Amino acid sequence: MRFFPTGRSMSLEQNYTEILSQIGEDVSREGLLDTPKRAAKAMKYLCRGYEQTLEEVTNNALFSSDNSEMVLVRDIELYSMCEHHMLPFIGKAHVAYLPKGKVLGLSKVARIVDMYARRLQIQENLSRQIAEAVQQVTGAAGVAVVVEAKHMCMMMRGVEKQNSTMITSVMLGEFRDNAATRSEFLSLIK
């Protein structure tokens, strides 16, 4: 089942109208006339990861290769929303894997990051989901993921710390078990 079945957009629009009304806005004023429709459309876009599957985003782009050395895609920008406040967190992901006979099409790594980032999420889970997806698709000897992000829920509200960055990492297989492999990855993303 798709996350936004037909007709659900209308209820999203109605909910945004109600939110605007509840915060004291005049929903009939000129600047807000189309806001509920635009906000519903934006929310569908920002949460489009619910509409995607791993099979769809990788699209069988797995290729035979004798390479067993590290493959790293660095600085993949990501935009997500925290599940606690529904505020954005923005950053980048570094994803590496050690192939075992198969390599994944380059753009597919970024598409995996996007699919999971475009869901209500916490960064810790996002990092793990990316790593496990790459592992599942490639059957790699190891996968490493580091995500660095700035969280609007910490910058705009609460403690209001604008210069903090959260860093999470997940190491699977050889990256977890072999300190030299892990160190090589970490040195490459500096």
From Swiss-Prot:
Assembly: Homomer.
A single Gene Ontology CC term: cytoplasm
Enzyme class: hydrolase
HAMAP family linked to this entry: FolE
InterPro entries: GTP-CH-I_C/QueF, GTP-CH-I_N, GTP_CycHdrlase_I, GTP_CycHdrlase_I_CS, GTP_CycHdrlase_I_dom
Lineage: Bacteria, Pseudomonadati, Pseudomonadota, Gammaproteobacteria, Pseudomonadales
Known EC number: 3.5.4.16
Family: Belongs to the GTP cyclohydrolase I family.
Catalytic activity: GTP + H2O = 7,8-dihydroneopterin 3'-triphosphate + formate + H(+)
Protein name per UniProt: GTP cyclohydrolase 1 1
